[in-house]
Amino acid sequence: MKNWFLLLAMVFAFAACTPRLEEKVAETYPDGKTQKTQFFDKKGTCVKEVEYYETGQVKMEGGMKGDKRDGEWKAYFPDGRVQSIGTFVNGLRTGKATVWQSNGNLLQEGYYKEGRHIGHWKWYDEQGNLLREVDYPE
């Protein structure tokens, strides 16, 4: 009995420490369905954004700092599979970026720094064969 009480107390303590975000509908489709939601911290700063297809399936989601993308962002195909993953810092693409085709094969992969291509980039055809490679200056 003591173990259950201790476990329950720990769950409530953890839940109380978890930051609560306020969710607001930012945009809607003409039919009234949600197109974009934003999540705000206690200070009123937008910290996450989620965009939806008209079906309600998540189209894109990621972190925000105010009005700029910040952190990991993922885009999804209408069936829910991941289409792309990338990172933003202060609204600019930074770090590794990977994009897949609807058949699951890679489309492109490479790196960004402050919004521009850097380093080695690769592009693939629909069958996953390497089409081209480009080396961008750091």
Which functions belong to the PLM regions below?
Residues 17-77, 81-89, 93-101, 105-113, ...:
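Periodic aromatic/glycine/histidine/acidic cluster detector
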Residues 4-13:
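Sec-dependent N-terminal signal peptides
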